[in-house]
Amino acid sequence: MCGGCVGTEYPERGTTCLEGGSFLLNFVGCARCGRRDFVLLGNRAAGLHGDDEIITYDHLCKNCHHLIARHEYTFSVVDDYQEYTMLCLLCGRAEDSVSILPDDPRQMTPLF
């Protein structure tokens, strides 16, 4: 992975967890060939680790195939919530939690 290709290493992305794609605003250009072009996705793998679904892939320079970053996305169900995480040098770090119930108990206001 190459810190010279990105503007900010592991930027904080809040709840934006990407299952695919790239955060191109953080790509400053390839440290090897010096070009700023599209980013290819390679070596994509999806599988289960216990009850977690994990998707990994590499961000590669379109021109010289230099490895910019490795991307990891996870999905799991914990209690009544769908949990998402993302960790990537280029795309950043993020977490999200969504209730599987029609009404999210965390969003309900107490009556008293």
UniProtKB/Swiss-Prot annotation:
Keywords: Activator, Developmental protein, Metal-binding, Transcription, Transcription regulation, Zinc. Zn(2+) 3 binds at residues 59, 71, 88, 91. InterPro entries: Churchill_sf, Transcrpt_activator_Churchill. Zn(2+) 1 binds at residues 2, 5, 30, 66. Pfam families: Churchill (PF06573). GO terms for molecular function: zinc ion binding. Zn(2+) 2 binds at residues 30, 33, 61, 64. Gene3D superfamilies: Transcription activator, Churchill. The keyword rRNA-binding does not apply. GO terms for biological process: fibroblast growth factor receptor signaling pathway; positive regulation of DNA-templated transcription. Belongs to the Churchill family. Transcriptional activator that mediates FGF signaling during neural development. Plays a role in the regulation of cell movement. Does not bind DNA by itself. This is Protein Churchill.
